[in-house]
Regions:
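Structural signature of tandem-repeat unit edges
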Residues: 2-19, 29-42, 52-65, 75-88, ...
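A structural signal for leucine-rich repeat
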Residues: 459-464, 487-492
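Consensus positions within tandem repeat domains that build extended binding/scaffold surfaces
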Residues: 21-26, 44-49, 67-72, 90-95, ...
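Short acidic DE-rich linear segments
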Residues: 506-508
Length: 508
C-alpha cells in the first residue's frame, strides 16, 4: 500500500497513483483537503475514515468505485460531488458525515451500499439516480435535515430503516414499482404528514411508520394484505386511515397509541391482533364487517372514547381484556358465534349499562365485567355453566341478577363489592361457590342456597369490606341440607337460616 504525505493539512497524492488503499488516511485528524489525481480508479476501504477536519475533496472522473467506509466520520465535510465515472458506492461510505449538506450522485451510480449516508444530520436534499433499483438498509437513516426525496420508478426495494429518523421529511411518494418495504423504513419521520402506500407491497412491515408523530392521513392501496406489528405505533396525529378490502390481518400493536384516530372501517379484516388499537383514546367508532373472526386480547383496551362498536356474527373469539377500560362504551351486543367471554373482556367499562349475552356463551371468564360501575342488570343465558373469578366484581350499580339453572360453578369474588345487589338465588346445579364471592355486598339481605352445594367458604357471603357480617335477614336453605349449612356457616348467622320444605312434585 502506497504511503502518502500530509503537508499543511493537504494530502499529497502523486500522479500515477491508481488506488488509494485501505485505511490510507484513516484517523488523520489534521487532514483538511484532498485532490485525487486522474490516475486513481478506486478509493479503498476506510481510506479517509475519521478524518474529522477534512472539509473538501475532489474526486476525478477516473474513479469507478468508492469502497465501504471510505469517508465515514468525516464530520467537517460539507459537500461532495461524485463523478459520472462512479458506478458503485460502498456501505457506510459517508456515514456520520454530520456537516454534509449536499451531495450530487450521478446517474451512472446503480448500486448504493447499506448505510451510505446514515447519520448525515445536515444533509437536506439528495437525488437518487434513475438506474438504482434498491435503496438499502439504513441508507438515509438519521438524516435529520433531509426534507425531500424522490424515489425513482425503477426502485423495487426499500430496505430496513432506510429513511428512519428523517425528522424533516414532510412527504414521500412511493412508486408502484416497489415490491418490498423493510422494517422501520420510515419510522420516526416526525414531520411526515401523509402517505399513500402502494398495493404492489403486500405487507406493511414492523414499525414501517412507527412514531411518525405528524402523520395525519394514510391511504393504503388495494393489494396490501397485512398491516404488520407496530406498523403505525405512536402516530399521535393520525386521524384517518383507509383500509382496503385486500387487508386480511391487522397485527399486534399495529395502531397502539394512535391517540388522534377517531374512526376506522375494516371491510374484510379477519383478525385484529393483540393490542392492535390499544390506547387509541380518540377512537369513537369502529366498524367490522362479516369477515372478522377474531378480536385478540387487549385489541381495543384503553379506547376511552369508544361509544359504538358492532361485533359481527362471524366473530368466534373475543380475547382477554379486549375492551378493557373503554370507559365511554354504553352498550354492546355479543354475537351468537362467541362461546366464551374470557379474562377481563369488558373490565373497567364504567359507562356500560347493558350487554346482551347470547345463548352460545358457556363461560363468563374471570374479571369479564369487573368494575363496570354503571351496569344495573344483566341476563345470563341458560347456556352458561361457569361464572369466573371476579366476573362482576365491583359492579356497584348492579341491583339484580338472575343466575340460570345451567350454572354449575361460581368462582372466587365473582360478585365481590356489588354494593347495590339486594338478593341472590344460587341455582340447583351449583356444587361450588368460591371464597369472597359476595363479600362487600352491603345491600344484600337475602340468599337462597341449593341442595347441590358441596363446598362453601365462610367468607363466601357474609362479610363486608371491613370484615364485619352483612346485615342479612334470611338465608334460605333446603331442609335436607340445613345441617350441612349450619356446619359451614358462622354461628352468628345460624338464626338467619330459614329451612325450606322440598318442592312438591307435580302429578302427571
Amino acid at each position: 500500500m502506497a504511503k502518502f504525505e500530509i503537508k499543511d493539512g493537504v494530502a499529497i497524492i502523486p500522479d500515477g497513483t491508481t488506488e488509494i488503499g485501505e485505511l490510507a488516511f484513516w484517523n488523520c485528524t489534521s487532514l483538511e483537503s484532498v485532490t485525487i489525481p486522474e490516475s486513481v480508479t478506486e478509493i479503498g476501504y476506510g481510506a479517509f475514515d475519521s478524518c474529522t477536519s477534512l472539509k473538501s475533496i475532489t474526486i476525478p472522473n477516473s474513479v469507478t468505485y468508492i469502497r465501504d467506509h471510505a469517508f465515514r466520520g468525516c464530520t467537517s465535510l460539507e459537500s461532495i460531488t461524485i463523478p459520472e465515472s462512479v458506478t458503485k458506492v460502498g456501505e457506510k461510505a459517508f456515514q456520520d458525515c454530520k456537516s454534509l449538506k449536499s451531495v450530487i450522485i450521478p446517474e451512472s451510480v446503480t448500486n448504493m451500499g447499506k448505510s451510505v449516508f446514515w447519520g448525515c444530520t445536515s444533509l437536506q436534499s439528495v437525488n437518487i439516480p434513475e438506474l438504482v433499483t434498491e435503496i438499502g438498509d439504513n441508507v438515509f437513516a438519521s438524516c435529520r435535515s433531509l426534507n425531500s426525496v424522490v424515489i425513482p420508478e425503477r426502485v423495487t426495494k426499500i430496505g430496513n430503516d432506510a429513511f428512519c429518523d428523517c425528522r424533516s421529511l414532510t412527504s414521500v411518494t412511493i412508486p408502484e414499482s416497489v415490491k418490498t418495504i423493510g422494517e422501520g423504513a420510515f419510522g420516526s419521520c416526525s414531520s411526515l404528514k401523509s402517505i399513500t402506500f402502494p398495493g404492489s407491497v403486500g405487507t406493511i412491515r414492523y414499525r414501517t411508520f412507527a412514531r411518525c408523530t405528524s402523520l395525519e392521513n394514510v391511504i393504503i392501496s388495494k393489494g396490501v394484505k397485512k398491516i404488520g406489528y407496530e406498523a403505525f405505533e405512536g402516530c399521535t396525529s393520525l386521524k384517518s386511515i383507509s383500509v382496503p378490502v385486500s387487508v386480511k390481518e391487522i397485527d399486534d400493536d399495529a395502531f397502539v397509541n394512535c391517540t388522534s384516530l377517531e374512526s376506522i372501517v375494516l371491510p374484510k379484516v379477519k383478525k385484529i391482533g393483540h393490542s392492535a388499537f390499544w390506547g387509541c383514546t380518540s377512537l369513537e367508532s369502529i366498524r367490522m364487517l362479516e369477515s372478522t373472526t377474531e378480536i385478540s386480547a387487549k385489541a381495543f383496551s384503553g379506547c376511552v372514547s369508544l361509544k359504538n362498536i358492532t361485533i359481527p356474527n362471524s366473530v368466534s373469539e373475543i380475547g382477554g381484556s379486549a375492551f378493557e377500560g373503554c370507559t365511554s362504551l354504553e352498550s354492546i351486543a355479543i354475537p351468537n358465534s362467541v362461546t366464551e367471554l374470557v379474562l377481563g373482556a369488558f373490565e373497567g367499562c364504567t359507562s356500560l349499562k347493558s350487554i346482551a349475552i347470547p345463548n352460545s356463551v358457556t363461560h363468563i371468564g374471570g374479571d369479564a365485567f369487573r368494575g363496570c360501575t354503571s351496569l344495573e342488570s344483566i341476563a345470563i343465558p341458560n347456556s352458561v355453566t361457569y361464572i369466573g373469578n371476579g366476573a362482576f366484581r365491583g359492579c356497584t350499580s348492579l341491583e339484580s341478577i338472575t343466575i340460570p339453572e345451567s350454572v354449575k360453578r361460581i368462582g372466587k369474588s365473582a360478585f365481590e363489592g356489588c354494593t347495590s345487589l339486594e338478593s341472590i338465588t344460587i341455582p340447583k346445579l351449583v356444587t361450588e361457590i368460591g371464597e369472597n364471592t359476595f363479600i362487600g355486598c352491603a345491600s344484600l339481605t337475602s340468599i337462597t342456597l341449593p341442595e347441590s352445594l358441596v363446598w362453601i367458604s365462610k367468607s363466601t357471603f357474609f362479610y363486608d369490606i371491613n370484615g364485619t357480617y352483612l346485615v342479612l335477614t334470611a338465608i334460605y336453605v333446603p331442609v335436607v341440607k340445613a345441617d350441612f349449612y349450619k356446619q359451614r356457616l358462622p354461628e352468628e348467622l345460624h338464626d338467619k337460616i330459614v329451612e325450606l320444605a322440598p318442592e312438591k312434585k307435580t302429578k302427571k
